[in-house]
Amino acid sequence: MSFPKLFQSVLLFVLIFAPTVQAGDSMIITDFSSPVSASGVPAGWELKEKNGKADFAVVKDGDIAAGRFRSANTSYSLQKEVKVDLKQYPLLTWKWKVTKLPAGGDFRKSKTDDQAAQLFVAFSKTKAIVYIWDTTAPVGLMEDTSPVPFMTVMVVVLRSGTNEIGKWVVETRNVYDDYKKLYGSEPPAVNGIRLQINSQHTGTSAESYFADVLFKRQ
């Protein structure tokens, strides 16, 4: 994971973005069906490279339109500015699939802090929740891992290891409840979503897919 300047980059990027689609009971963040730019980035999103060159593409995996992330000793993310009131849309759902985990990855140590799939929910310049598919850390673990003063990034391990590797997994999280549990207060609006992959700490490689990211009413 990459925390320095996380929130500044999520909230202050100057890319002209397409609006989030709101339709009654849901707010579509992306279904990877929107047009892509000349560089292959979906409309409304920004590709941010931290270490090395990004290997991202919008693909069809069977009948699923998805964002494919490949990492070889690199770190990069796809991010979008959004505005979501969690009192109205508390549920975040998405599909993800990991086809290769970074060998030895474990977010609990800075030297091994690599994951094939991470979904950041940014609330401000100082607070975020990140849902991860880790190589080693146990499912259900929740920890503050930000090394930056005055910034809190709460990590929630949703998947770990190879048990479901190569399979599409559907996740649903009540982000409103998660925020109250992790921060002990009412959540502010969600300001940004970030999809990330990295393998530079372990010097390995990884691959994952994301699809159908949206917020829903309860």
Short names for language-model regions:
Residues Q8-A18:
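Bacterial N-terminal signal peptides
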Residues K95-L101, S124, Y176, N198:
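Solvent-exposed strand-to-loop "edge" motifs in beta-rich extracellular domains
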Residues A23-E49:
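Extracellular carbohydrate-recognition regions
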Residues D114-L119, M151-T152, V156-G161, I165-G203:
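Extracellular beta-strand ligand-recognition surfaces/modules
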Residues F32, I193, D212-F215:
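Extracellular beta-strand elements of beta-rich domains used
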Residues A54-S77:
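Short carbohydrate-recognition loop motifs
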Residues T99-K167, A206-Y209:
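Extracellular ligand-binding interfaces
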Residues E81-L92, T162-I165, E186:
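Extracellular/lumenal carbohydrate-interaction signature centered on repeated Trp-anchored short motifs
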